[in-house]
C-alpha cells in the first residue's frame, strides 16, 4: 500500500515536524584523502578578510604576519576582521559595570585552579599534534613525549606534577638555542627466509637523535596541525579543523577556565551549560523580553548566523580582553593568561599530508608532501589548486603556513562567547539611550537576538545598531543567513523555540541502535538511550515501546543470539539451543544467551543482570558472574561506566550507563596490524603508562583517592601511602610483624634507588 507522506502531518503541529527536515538518518559524510586543500582555503580566506591590515615579520621565525587590528573601519556587508581595540575595551568595561565584580571574582577562582591543576589535565582529548614526531598522537602519548624531551634537555620543573610548572618549562624551552629530540623510524630490508626460501620484508625499529635549532623548535611549538572535520551533516563542502600541540594546550586551558567562570555568571551565555539547563536559561531571557513588551512594544527575534566567526576573530583582541579582565591581578597570573593569545598571534598552520598524484597511463601514484608545495612546478595542478598555492606561497616556512589573524575552530569557545555577550549586554535601555533595546543569547558563534521597540522603524534601527556594533569587534552578522521573526519562534544551537522549546528528536536518531562495544555494555547503553529520550526529548510511551522492540531485534541480529526456541539458524544457534534445553528457568537467561526480553518502558533503569538475577538457575549465576571464570572481565568494575555517544549535532557526549561485570563484558584485543608499523615504540610507551597508572590506582582506590595536593611524584605518593597502610594493618593485627618489616624495607630500597638515579 502506498502512503501519501503528507497524511503523516495532518495531526502534527507544524513546529513538531521540523525534525523531519534534518539530515540525521543514515551515515554522516566522512572525508577521504588529504585536508591540505581545505587548510589552504582557511589560511587564504583568513588573510583575505584582513587584507587591509599591516604586514610585519616575526623576528624569531621569519614568518610574515598580517595584523588587521584597528584597521580601516569595515564596509557594510563584507566580512572583515578589523576589530577596534578601544571598542573592545569599552564593551568589556560596560560588561563589568552591569555585573560588578564579575572579572575580579572569576580571576580569584581561576587562580585557585591554576595552582591546583596537575599536568595530567592535558592527557584528556584525543588526537594532539606531537611536535617531537611531527604528526598526530593520542594526547597522553604526545604529553609523555614532550615531557621526556624536556627532561633530556635539562628542563625539570615539570617533575612537580603541576601544570603551571610544566608551562614554566615550555617558556624556558623557547629561550633555548637548540633542543635535542628522539624520533622513531623504521627500516625495511628484503631478506630470504631460511625456511621457505621466499623473499620477505623485515622491519626493524630504530630511534635516532636529532637537534632542532631555536627557529625550527619555535615553528614546531607554534604549529597547529590540521585535519578535515568528519561527519558533518547538511554541508556540501568539508572544512579544516586544527589540533594544537602540547606547548599551547596548557595556556589555552587556563584562559578558557577564566572565560568559563565568567560565562557561568552571564545570563545570556549558552555555555558552559547544556541540555535542559541550557533550555531553562534561554527560556528565561525570552520570558523577560516578552513580559516587558506587553501591549505597547513590538518584539522581534533574529535567528542569527555569523559569517566565518573564527576567521575574523583575532588573538590580539583576546589579549586586549584578558589584559582588561585581569588588570588588578598579580603579575604572574596576568603573564600566564596572556601567553595563549600571544602564541596564537604567531601561530603556524601545518598543511597536512599534501597532495596525491596518480598517472592513469603509467599506473603510478606519488605523494607530494606539504613541504614541497613551496618549490614544486605548478603546471601539475589544476587551476583552482594552482591559485591556492600561489596565494599561500609567501606564507610558507618549513611546510607550515604563517597564520597570524583568525582563531582556529573550537580553541577559545568560552572567551569568544564573552565577547558576544558583551554586545548583547549593550542592549539595555541605559546604554541605547533611545526607545529600542535588545537582549539575546550567545553560544560560541551562534546567537539569537531579541529586539523590542514601539514600532517597526525602531526594530530596524535597533538591528542596525547591533549589526554595526558587532562590526567594530570583528563580528560579522550575515544579513543573508539571519532571519527575523515575531518573538516566540526562533532557533538557537539547534534548539527550536516555538512558545517553548520543541523536542528536536531527529538529533538523537544516530544514538539509537547497537553500539558495538560488547554484549553487556550494548544492552545497557541501548535501554539507557531510550530512557533518556523519554525524559528529555518527548519520546512518548508507545514510541518508546516500539523503539525498545526494534532495539532488541537489532541486538539479537547483531550478536546472533535469537531466543533459544526460535527457528532462525545462526552460527551461535547450536550452542544457544543446548543452553536453552538444559536451563530450568528459561526467563533467567540473558538476551545475549538466547533468553527472552523482560524489558518494558517501566524498568529501563535496571541492568539486565539485576532484572533477571532472581530468575536465574544457580549454576548459570555461578558461570555468569564468577570472578574466577576466565571469561569475566577482570577490571574492577565501577558501578557506572561511560560511553561516548555521538549525537547528530555538537561534540561527543559522555553518557553514563550501569555496568555489571559478567562473562559478556569482554574487552576486544588490540588490532595486530599496529604491531608492524613505526607506531610500535609508541605502543610500548602506552603499555608502560597503563601499568604505572594501574599500579597507582591499586594504591589509591577510588573510594579513598584524594588527589595528592602538594608536590610529590607518583612514586613518592605510593611509597608514603604504602607505609601508612602497612602501619594501620600492622596495628590492627591484619598483618604480622615480619610482613610489616619487609614492607618497610622495600619502601626504603625504592627511595634509595630513586636517590641514586
Curated annotation (Swiss-Prot):
HAMAP family, alphabetized: INFV_RDRP
A GO biological process held by the record: DNA-templated transcription
The protein's name in its UniProt record: RNA-directed RNA polymerase catalytic subunit
Taxonomic superkingdom: Viruses
Similarity remark: Belongs to the influenza viruses polymerase PB1 family.
Domain RdRp catalytic positions: 286-483
Region (Disordered) residue spans: 53-82
One Gene Ontology cellular component: host cell nucleus
UniProt EC number: 2.7.7.48
Substrates-to-products reaction catalysed: RNA(n) + a ribonucleoside 5'-triphosphate = RNA(n+1) + diphosphate
Main subcellular location of this protein, as a coarse class: host cell
Motif (Nuclear localization signal): 187-195, 203-216
Region (Promoter-binding site): 249-256
Function: RNA-dependent RNA polymerase which is responsible for replication and transcription of virus RNA segments. The transcription of viral mRNAs occurs by a unique mechanism called cap-snatching. 5' methylated caps of cellular mRNAs are cleaved after 10-13 nucleotides by PA. In turn, these short capped RNAs are used as primers by PB1 for transcription of viral mRNAs. During virus replication, PB1 initiates RNA synthesis and copy vRNA into complementary RNA (cRNA) which in turn serves as a template for the production of more vRNAs.
Compositionally skewed regions (Polar residues) per UniProt: 55-64
Alphabetical UniProt keywords: Eukaryotic host gene expression shutoff by virus, Eukaryotic host transcription shutoff by virus, Host cytoplasm, Host gene expression shutoff by virus, Host nucleus, Host-virus interaction, Inhibition of host RNA polymerase II by virus, Nucleotide-binding, Nucleotidyltransferase, Phosphoprotein, RNA-directed RNA polymerase, Transferase, Viral RNA replication, Viral transcription
Subunit structure: Influenza RNA polymerase is composed of three subunits: PB1, PB2 and PA. Interacts (via N-terminus) with PA (via C-terminus). Interacts (via C-terminus) with PB2 (via N-terminus); this interaction is essential for transcription initiation.
Post-translational modification: Phosphorylated by host PRKCA.
GO MF, one annotated term: RNA binding
Organism name: Influenza A virus (strain A/X-31 H3N2)
Localisation per UniProt entry: Host nucleus; Host cytoplasm
